[in-house]
Swiss-Prot record:
This is Glutamate 5-kinase. Residues 276-353 form the PUA domain. HAMAP family: ProB. The keyword Nucleus does not apply. SUPFAM superfamilies: Carbamate kinase-like, PUA domain-like. Its EC number is 2.7.2.11. Pathway: Amino-acid biosynthesis; L-proline biosynthesis; L-glutamate 5-semialdehyde from L-glutamate: step 1/2. It comes from Shouchella clausii (strain KSM-K16). Substrate binds at residues 49, 136, 148. One of its GO terms (cellular component) is cytosol. The gene is proB. It catalyses: L-glutamate + ATP = L-glutamyl 5-phosphate + ADP. Signal peptide: none annotated.
Length: 372
């Protein structure tokens, strides 16, 4: 089997027993399957849920808590137990697990975003297996990923993974809920995530987790946009993970299965940055950006809004509709001076060295509303 990197997301429903508590037996089964991949030369990053499940009974809850404060308290107790279970299980097979706890703010800050990428690559280089979870005990509602499906998609992008595997207790994606409709049709392969399918599938979560099938499809959509192919399905058994990479997985494969990926810089721009302002451009500039792969020059700028500086991320509009985001080489004040001018005139006025308002290497088109 060829070498590569995959991200495996293991949800709470795949890690818990009938009472919703952490099942060490089930966890070790997943670890054994992951180690089988490592033996074959595959780099693996694990995104795991289960901290709440591991901790809630130890602080007196008789069932999985539902309020944010209760879940954060349970996660504070359970995260160390969950990680210890992973470390013990991987150690049995001669591997070292490495814990990373992430929040949405880690991705929003460009320096921290870069550090995540560098740390993951160094861990893989050293033969460790990164085990990632959201930092549930400190995340506030506005800064959460929503669920680990989304987190796993973002991780797959930052590491340029070959595949994202979203393991669940359902064996793939159906056109209807198979529990309600005996005639539900299973999709074995989808090149993309159709909006019509997103409208039909359930957003319901399991009793032990936060992500339903809709969450997984949204994560798949994000991963595909980032250049990572996706598998959604069953993840039980030692050979299961290998079967998935061989195209024999019990589930649904999603994506174009090409090698086209989005650069880490562009990932941060489109999925994580907060625009400091915006500009409106003309039709010629829109064509240059969207169809010809060119940079944006001052001549195509009509107006600017906000209070931004050179180096900030700004949103670009055409006909009052957003078409993308990019890093500006000019401040808002400078753009007001040079909008509509040719490049030589603009450089003469601003004394800048760069001709482009937004260079194509720091531009990302957003043709329609993305899943972030």
């Amino acid at each position: 089997m060829a070498t590569g990197t995959i991200v495996i997301k293991i949800g709470s429903s795949s890690l818990t027993d009938g009472n919703g508590a952490l099942s060490t037996e089930r966890l070790r089964g997943h670890v054994e399957a992951i180690c089988e991949l490592r033996h074959q030369g595959i780099n693996v990053i694990v995104v795991t849920s289960g901290a709440v499940a591991a901790g809630f009974t130890l602080i007196g809850y008789h069932q999985r808590p539902k309020s944010i404060s209760q879940k954060q308290a349970a996660a504070a107790v359970g995260q160390s137990l969950l990680m210890q279970a992973y470390m013990d299980a991987f150690r049995l097979h001669g591997y070292t697990a490495a814990q990373l706890l992430l929040t949405r703010a880690d991705f929003a800050d460009p320096a921290r975003f870069s550090n995540i990428s560098q740390t993951l690559r160094e861990l893989l280089k050293r033969g460790a297996i990164p085990v990632i979870n959201e930092n549930d005990s400190t995340s506030v509602d506005e800064l959460t990923f929503g669920d680990n499906d989304r987190l796993s998609a973002l991780v797959s992008g930052i590491i340029h993974a070959d595949m994202l595997c979203l393991y669940t207790d359902v064996n793939g994606v159906y056109d209807q809920n198979p529990n309600d409709s005996p005639n539900a049709k299973k999709y074995h392969y989808l090149a993309s995530v159709p909006e019509a399918l997103l409208d039909r599938v359930s957003a319901d979560t399991s009793a032990v987790g936060t992500g339903g099938m809709k969450s997984k499809l949204l994560a798949a959509k994000t991963a595909i946009e980032l250049g990572t192919n996706v598998f959604i399905g069953n993840g039980k058994g030692r050979e299961t993970f290998t079967d998935v990479l061989l195209g024999k997985g019990d589930g649904t494969y999603l994506g174009p299965f090409t090698n086209k990926t989005m650069s880490t810089t562009k990932q941060w721009i489109v999925f994580h940055s907060e625009p400091a302002g915006s500009i409106e451009i003309d039709s010629g500039a829109s064509t240059a950006l969207l169809k010809r792969g060119k940079s944006l020059l001052p001549a195509g700028v009509l107006s600017a809004k906000g209070d931004f500086s050179a180096g900030d991320i700004i949103e670009v509009f055409f006909n009052n509709r957003p078409i993308g985001k990019g890093k500006t080489n000019f401040s808002k004040h400078e753009l007001e001076l040079i909008k509509g001018l040719n490049s030589e005139e603009a450089l003469s006025l601003t004394k800048r060295s760069k001709k482009a308002v937004i260079h194509r290497d720091f531009w990302v088109a957003t043709k329609k509303e993305c899943s972030y």
